[in-house]
Amino acid sequence: MSKGRTDYGNGAVKYVIRAKLRANGYVERPDVVGAIFGQTEGLLGDDLDLRRLLKTGRIGRIDVKLRNENGKTVGEIIVPSSLDRVETALVAAALEQVDRIGPCRAEVEVVSIDDIRKEKRERMIRRAREILREMVSEVTPDSSELVQKVKEAVEDVEVEEYKGLPAGPNVEDSDAIIVVEGRADVANLLRCGIKNVIAVEGTNVPEAIVELSKEKTVTAFVDGDRGGELILKELLQVADVDYVAKAPKGKEVEELTRKEIKRALERKVPVEEYLKEIGERPKDKEREKGKKPKPKKRPERRGRPRKKKARPKRGPQERRLLDRLKRLKGTFRAEFLDEGLKPVKEVELDELVEKLKSEDGVRAVVLDGVITRRLVEAAREKGVKYVVGVKEGDLDPEIKKDVKIITMS
């Protein structure tokens, strides 16, 4: 281990959660670890279950350092994380829910969340300086250009503030703005010459963003991970967003190159199209303004009242498939089911068709979204019998001959 560096045993570690612990009695490390796993179970759902995260390597080994003072125990809990910022913050908050260790009352308080990548960047800059010093004796006429490029790469751009939020200088005057997650995202876009950018700084969208969205064209530019989805969900609920742009899958806006940023913004889609893709209705503008739509007058009918159409009776298999759909509600994901209608794989909606094409033995596809023509065609090719979704898109009767389409309605 190098001097001044901590080895967390996982090269993918992005953050380290540090929390202090106090217990009103004598406890040992196994008691603490057991309490953490036991009392956080079920708090964050299956995807962020600590045992599952540890097993898959998304968090590292939980380190506990304890000392006993006058019959009480104090110490430190250290949790390395390769999750994104939002998920890491959720795990940290879950640690604070531990209130009992063994027979003793206890209290856990998160002290800090360290950004390991910041430490790596600082080491990289120090090493770059050393390399440049070693090259001084070999300076060529072009070396000044090299020095300038290295300086530009490590220089921090000036991030301004708009009503307390990190922002570029053109936010107030521009007719259109780009909304990102954090300060680092703003800095990265400023380096690329994009100055009409502002950050929400968390999942609670500030009032300043809501007000700006009422008078400007808004593009939400989010990370290509679960954290980005959460930010986008919150934005769409409270702000008037016009376009949606996403970083490549698994990447954060703050780490994108100029070329990747340009490509992502060029591929932005209208919010109505995005909502259609994930199976949600665009907001009704009349309802947003508080106006109730006028009820349509229906002509009076004489004679016997018309009978309501009865919903088709569902067979046991269909009911079982619709139950699977209810479990997926709000996840923007899809499941592949085998011959026994048991789940074999779960995928993101944006990679559903490609994953289906490479998967064998799938009998049913259940998705929290719209059933599209492209999906049904892929299902026919793979011999899928059922496709189950929130609603049906514009489908030709011809392509539905070999695949049974099931929706909630």
From Swiss-Prot:
Mg(2+) 2 binds at D223, D225. Residues 175-261 form the Toprim domain. Keywords: DNA replication, DNA-directed RNA polymerase, Exosome, Magnesium, Metal-binding, Nucleotidyltransferase, Primosome, Transcription, Transferase. One of its GO terms (molecular function) is poly(A) binding. Binds two Mg(2+) per subunit. Its cofactor is Mg(2+). It catalyses: ssDNA + n NTP = ssDNA/pppN(pN)n-1 hybrid + (n-1) diphosphate. GO terms for cellular component: cytoplasm; DNA-directed RNA polymerase complex; exosome (RNase complex); primosome complex. Its EC number is 2.7.7.101. GO terms for biological process: DNA replication, synthesis of primer. Residues 280-289 have a biased composition (Basic and acidic residues). Mg(2+) 1 binds at E181, D223. Residues 280-322 are annotated as: Disordered. Belongs to the archaeal DnaG primase family. Forms a ternary complex with MCM helicase and DNA. Component of the archaeal exosome complex. This is DNA primase DnaG. The lineage of its organism: Archaea, Methanobacteriati, Methanobacteriota, Methanomada group, Methanopyri. The gene is dnaG.
